[in-house]
From Swiss-Prot:
Transmembrane segments: 6-26, 56-78, 83-101, 113-133, 154-174
The entry's keywords: Cell inner membrane, Cell membrane, Lipid biosynthesis, Lipid metabolism, Membrane, Phospholipid biosynthesis, Phospholipid metabolism, Transferase, Transmembrane, Transmembrane helix
Protein name (record): Glycerol-3-phosphate acyltransferase
Disulfide bonds: none
Species of provenance: Bradyrhizobium sp. (strain ORS 278)
Gene: plsY
Cellular location(s): Cell inner membrane
Cross-referenced InterPro entries: G3P_acylTferase_PlsY
Annotated pathway: Lipid metabolism; phospholipid metabolism
Length: 198
């Protein structure tokens, strides 16, 4: 299959991998309450942490990141760099809007990191360092994710990675949209801080 013909396949591969709801699967296997009825109702690692199962939350974070990385690596091997980037976009969309869960998924932070790892891993380290610094200073997980995701495409662009900067600018816009309720709570001063009980 030619590289051009591979592009829609890469998008589909990414979407299907991204649609795997690790948080929901792991919490069901562990016999906990339906994740969608806990806390924010989100299927990501932050909400899994609200079950009190730190191991499950870590496993969810890892699984969600790995599906982004796997999509990029598989598509890159089959169709090159453009296919890899499209697979990353597909994985992100799959996580946010999974077909298996009536298009109601997670917020995309772990998958964002996983895609960065697959495409240009040093920038995943940059993202995590910014996240940690912001989270330490503010105690807000959502704010840390927003700051790190906004800075990532700017830094990619500054170092000449224009195609990747464009991709991650799009992912950042989607991530901001998925955090719109968090942004409202941050502005109102009602957002939960890291370590706070809900």
């Amino acid at each position: 299959m030619g590289s051009e013909a591979m592009l829609p396949v890469a998008l589909l591969i990414g979407y299907l991998l991204g649609s795997i709801p690790f948080g929901l699967i792991l919490t069901k296997l562990a016999g906990t309450q339906d994740l969608r009825s806990i806390g924010s109702g989100n299927i990501g690692a932050t909400n899994v942490l609200r079950t009190g199962r730190k191991g499950l939350a870590a496993a969810t974070l890892l699984g969600d990141a790995l599906k982004g990385t796997a999509a990029v690596i598989i598509a890159g091997y089959l169709g090159g760099s453009n296919a890899a980037m499209l697979a990353g976009l597909g994985a992100f969309l799959g996580h946010l809007f999974p077909v298996w869960l009536k298009f109601r998924g997670g917020k995309g932070v772990a998958v964002y990191i996983g895609i960065l790892i697959g495409l240009l891993w040093p920038y995943a380290i940059f993202f995590c360092l910014v996240w940690l610094a912001t989270a330490f200073a503010s105690r807000y997980s959502s704010l840390a994710a927003l700051v790190a995701s906004v800075l990532t495409p700017i830094v990619l662009w500054a170092f000449g990675h224009t195609a990747l900067a464009a991709l991650f600018a799009l992912l950042t816009l989607l991530l901001i949209y998925m955090h719109r309720e968090n942004i409202k709570r941050l502005r109102a001063g009602t957002e939960s801080k890291i370590g706070a009980k809900k």
